[in-house]
Amino acid sequence: GLKDWWNKHKDKIIAVAKEMGKAGLQAA
């Protein structure tokens, strides 16, 4: 289910989210 998918991918998702957050702050 969704929780299994999240547990499998969360590290990558979090890393990407952090990178996007940094880019957003720099662009602002």
From Swiss-Prot:
UniProt keyword Secreted, yes or no: yes
**Which GO CC annotations does the UniProt entry carry?**
extracellular region
* GO MF annotation list: toxin activity
Is Transit peptide given among the entry's keywords? Answer: no
> Residues where Alanine amide occurs?
28
Question: What subcellular locations does the record give?
Answer: Secreted
UniProt main location, coarse: secreted
Function, in words = Shows a broad spectrum of activity against both Gram-positive and Gram-negative bacteria. Also has antimicrobial activity against S.cerevisiae. Has insecticidal and non-hemolytic activity.
Q: What is this protein called?
A: U1-poneritoxin-Da4a
Source organism lineage?
A: Eukaryota, Metazoa, Ecdysozoa, Arthropoda, Hexapoda
